Amino acid sequence: GAADLVIAIGSRFADRQTGNLSKYTANRKFIHIDIDPAEIDKNVGSSLGLAGDMRTILKLLMRQTPKGDLAAWWVQIRAWQEEYDYDYHVGRLTVPWALHQVAQNTRGKAYAYATDVGQHQMWAALHLRVEEPRTWLTSGGLGTMGYGLPAAMGAQLAWGDSRRVIHIAGDGGIKMTGNEYYTIARLGLPVLSIIVNNCGLGMIRQLQKVLYDERYIACELDYEMDYVKYVESFGIKAVRVGAQDEFAAALKNALEDAAQPRVIVMDVWRSFVEPMAKGGARIDEFVDFK
C-alpha cells in the first residue's frame, strides 16, 4: 500500500482486515485511537496510541495537522475506481446486478439496509451505496446467521414512517429466523426483504472450495423449499424471480408499495464473492476462481 501513516479508529486489526500482518505493517507508522486502552498495541504496535472519545481526539489531531493538497491523490483514486469498476452487464440475474439495481433506485432517498450473514452480506457491502449514518445494519465478522430479519424489524420500528428498511438475506439465514415474518405481518412493518436463494450456505461453500479443495460438507441445501408460499402463509405479498427483467419489475412494484411488507425471492445459480484473499495472504493477493 501507499500509506506512510495509518490512523486507525476503533479497530482491533483482526486478520480479516490486515491479511499478512508483517506485510501490512511494513514501512508505515500507526496512530491507534480506541475507547478501550486494552485494544491499543494488542495486535499492531503503534507510534502513537490514544485512548478516549473519537470525536474529541480527532478534533485535537486536526488542530495539529496542516492542510495538504489532495488533488493528485483524488485523481489516482478515481483512476483505480475506473480500472476496477464492476461489470454488471452479464446478461443474467446475479446478486451484484440486483443490488446495483437496488442502489440505483434508492440512492438519495430515505432507506436503510439490514443484512444477514453470508455471500449476500459481502455483495451488499460491495454494491449498495450507504451514504448516511445508522442506515447500515450488519453483524460484520461475528457470523450471526439469522440476524438480518430481526434487525430489519427493529430498525423499521425505530424509523417508523421516516425511512424504509430493505433486508437482504440468504436462504440459510431465513431458515433460522424466518418465523419473524409473523411479527412483521402482525405489526404491518413495511420491510422489503430480498431473499437470495442459491440452495446452499454460499459463504461456507466458497471457503470449503478455497481452503479444503472442494471437499464440501453441510453446506448444500438441495431440498427445495418454496419461500414464496412460506412468506405468503404469514399474509405477506411475495414474488419469485429468476431473470433480470423479472427482478426489475418486482423491485419497482415493491418500492412503490411503500406501506406494506414485501418479499422478493431471487433464484440464482451458485457463484463466488470476489475479490477474496486467503487468510495469511496479503490483502491484495486474490484467489483466482477461474
Language-model segment annotations:
Residues 77-158:
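Active-site diphosphate/adenylate-binding microenvironment
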Residues 8, 32, 115, 167, ...:
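Structural beta-sheet core signal
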Residues 2, 24, 40-51, 55-59, ...:
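Thiamine diphosphate
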Residues 12, 118, 269:
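Active-site beta-loop-alpha junctions enriched in small/polar residues
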Residues 4, 10-13, 58-66, 81-85, ...:
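Structural signal for hydrophobic packing residues in well-ordered secondary-structure cores
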Residues 1-76, 254, 265:
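Glycine-rich, acidic loop regions that bind phosphate or pyrophosphate groups
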Residues 12, 91-96, 173-176, 244:
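Active-site glycine- and acidic-residue-rich loops that bind
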